[in-house]
């Protein structure tokens, strides 16, 4: 592949220890690299796939997971969105209902509340309300963690895990 990030990842170690010695953090394949590879593979195999969110194209999204995709994808498949969590998730729902597959990102888990209706009532329920005639192939990526302040460090996983129709996945 001619993608510069793919070439750089080919040189990284997929193990943290080689010959009993720890590999430098800069030389180890990271979780964000796995997200990049999985997304690139899906983009190559599914022409309906799109990805968007705040700063996804320009900065690579949260933790630079999408950095390098700009070299492989046209703007209409990977793009920046306005700062409107409800619009991000709402348009993903609409796109999925029309047969597309969306990989959308909210910068922080805390902002899921800004898209509450779209996540908890639309995204989670359309498939079951249609007796599985409609599918909702949407992946919503959010950052969960600490060190970003009181309104950027919450973990809503327990709440989301109790909503029928949603799945929570962690590395």
Where are these regions (language model features)?
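Thiamine diphosphate
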Residues: 2-171
